[in-house]
Amino acid sequence: MAAVTVEEIRKAQRADGPAAVLAIGTATPANYVTQADYPDYYFRITKSEHMTELKEKFKRMCDKSMIRKRYMYLTEDILKENPNMCAYMAPSLDARQDIVVVEVPKLGKEAAVKAIKEWGQPKSKITHLIFCTTSGVDMPGCDYQLTKLLGLRPSVKRFMMYQQGCFAGGTVLRLAKDLAENNRGARVLVVCSEITAVTFRGPADTHLDSLVGQALFGDGAAAVIVGADPNESIERPLYQLVSAAQTILPDSDGAIDGHLREVGLTFHLLKDVPGLISKNIEKSLKEAFGPIGISDWNSIFWIAHPGGPAILDQVEAKLGLKEEKLRATRQVLSEYGNMSSACVLFILDEMRKKCAEEGRATTGEGLDWGVLFGFGPGLTVETVVLRSVPINA
C-alpha cells in the first residue's frame, strides 16, 4: 500500500467550507446600576463627596455616555468590605484577584451554557476552547477553570488570552475561524468574560481618564460556538466568518494603555482616541471589502465595539453612515455599557434577535455582508468580514 503523503493528510485535516458562528449566549451579574443614579452612588461609596467640582464633571461624563444602565458584580456590601478598592490608588490587587479568579470563569460558564444549549450538540463535541479576559490573571487560567466548571473533555485544546482589552472580541473570532477551518470537525467554544473589579477605584482630579473608565465600563460575559461545515440537521449557522485582519494604527502609541499594578488595573487614554479611529477606519474597510467589490458602507451591517459615544459619533460622521447602521451597537452600549471584549458578541446577539423579531430576510438586518470591528490598546483594530444567513430559509 502506498504511503499517505503529507499533502493528503493536510487536505484531510482541513474543513471544506468557511467557519460560522453557530450559537451565541450572554450573561451578566444580577446586580446593576442606573447611569442617572451612578454619580451620587460612586462618590458616596468612595467617600469622595467633598470633591464637588469633580462630581459635577463625572455627572456630565455619565450624562453624555449614552448609557442607561450597567451590570456590576461589585455590590455596595462588597465595596464596604474592601475599602482599599474604593480609594484612588491604594494597594488592592490581592482583594481584586480573589474576586475575579473565581467570578470571571463563573460568569463565563453562564454564557457558555446558554450557547451550548442553543447549539444543540453534546458538550463532548467541543474540541477547542478560547477564553478571553482583561479581568485578572491566574495559573492555571480561566480556560482550565471553565473546562472543569462545564465538565468539558480533559483533551479539549485550550487557548487563554489575558490583558488584550477592548479589541479582543474580534481577536477571538479570528482565532476561532482559523481553528475551525484548519481542523475538520472542530467545534470551538469562545468565551469573553469581563468584571470591572480590576479597574474600579475612587476619583482623582489628576487622572480624568480613569474617571472616563468609571463612567463607561460594565460587567458581562458572552460565548459563541464556531465551526465549519455545519450539520444542517442540528446546527443553525448565524453568521459566516469570511475574513479577519488585525492592524496597529499609525501614530497611536499610548492612545489606550492599561497597567496591572498593586492598585489593580489602571486605565489611561489620550483624548484623541475617537479621532485616531475615525481617521483610519476607512483604510481597514477598503482592505477588507475591496476583494468583495463593496465600497458603500451603508450597504453592509455593522457590529462595532462601542468604546464610547464619541467614537461612534465620529465613525458615523466620517463614513456618512445612516443613523440606523449603529443601532445594535448603541443599544448594547445603552443597556450594558462598555464590557470590553464581550461587547461585539453581545451586539451580534442583539442583531440576530432583532432581525428575527422584525421579520428581516437575513441575520444582518436584511443585508448579506457586514463588518465587526474591535478597537483597543495599541491602538489595535480588529476587522472581521461577516456574511449573514437567511432567516427561516
From Swiss-Prot:
Disulfide topology: none
Pfam families the record matches: Chal_sti_synt_C, Chal_sti_synt_N
Catalytically driven reaction(s): (E)-4-coumaroyl-CoA + 3 malonyl-CoA + 3 H(+) = 2',4,4',6'-tetrahydroxychalcone + 3 CO2 + 4 CoA
Domain of life from the UniProt record: Eukaryota
Entry keyword set: Acyltransferase, Flavonoid biosynthesis, Transferase
GO-annotated biological processes: flavonoid biosynthetic process; polyketide biosynthetic process
EC number(s) reported in the record: 2.3.1.74
Broadest EC class assigned to this enzyme: transferase
Keyword Transferase attributed: yes
Active site: C166
Annotated pathway: Secondary metabolite biosynthesis; flavonoid biosynthesis
InterPro entries the UniProt entry points to: Chalcone/stilbene_synt_C (IPR012328), Chalcone/stilbene_synt_N (IPR001099), Chalcone/stilbene_synthase_AS (IPR018088), Polyketide_synthase_type-III (IPR011141), Thiolase-like (IPR016039)
A GO molecular function held by the record: naringenin-chalcone synthase activity
Record's function text: The primary product of this enzyme is 4,2',4',6'-tetrahydroxychalcone (also termed naringenin-chalcone or chalcone) which can under specific conditions spontaneously isomerize into naringenin.
Family: Belongs to the thiolase-like superfamily. Chalcone/stilbene synthases family.
Descriptive protein name: Chalcone synthase 2
Organism of this sequence: Ruta graveolens
Lineage, highest ranks first: Eukaryota, Viridiplantae, Streptophyta, Embryophyta, Tracheophyta
